[in-house]
Amino acid sequence: MDKTQPHPLFKLATELGPLIVFFVVNAKFNLFAATGAFMVAIVAAMIASYVVTKHVPLMAIVTGIVVLVFGTLTLVLHDETFIKLKPTIIYGLFAAVLGGGLLFNRSFIAIMFDQMFNLTPAGWRILTFRWALFFAAMAVLNEIIWRTQSTDFWVGFKAFGVVPLTMIFAIAQMPLIKRYHQDPASLEASDAAEGDVSKG
């Protein structure tokens, strides 16, 4: 099935919308009501993404599954620990998958973003390693915040701190992307030249 590229504002809405719902409902009611609303918003965002683009990103699917599992545990057991652990689990999982892939000479960042960037193999490895470190650091940061700060502070950080930090980190990778960028035309020419040599 063909995928269509969503409008940047739509993509931003599906990513930030559930977090804003989580923050607003927590401020008006409590964390348990916010957890239920967050679960509904996550599912709604995935459905909207599929309806508009005919595709749901893998990271969104993984995040949605973890949210539903830990959100359900939070509501059933009436224990806010589970929903607070959710970001740690997600970030830790992403870090482990990216880092583990590098051990087997696989760059999962390249698999996800090869249509957006044309990098050399070395560039993809470095970028993957950096994102693995970033997710590991975010897992540690989440643990520190929810264990040492108030619930309201943690919710505020989750809603308005995580996205800016991620965007800043992503922007900081642009010099690396430019340094290891390879022009598709020159890459095709190189492949053609190698083919001619092998035929000769």
UniProtKB/Swiss-Prot annotation:
The keyword Cell membrane applies. Disulfide bonds: none annotated. Keywords: Cell inner membrane, Cell membrane, Membrane, Transmembrane, Transmembrane helix. Coiled coil: none annotated. The keyword Cell membrane applies. InterPro entries: YciB. NCBIfam families: ispZ, PRK00259.1-1. Plays a role in cell envelope biogenesis, maintenance of cell envelope integrity and membrane homeostasis. This is Inner membrane-spanning protein YciB.
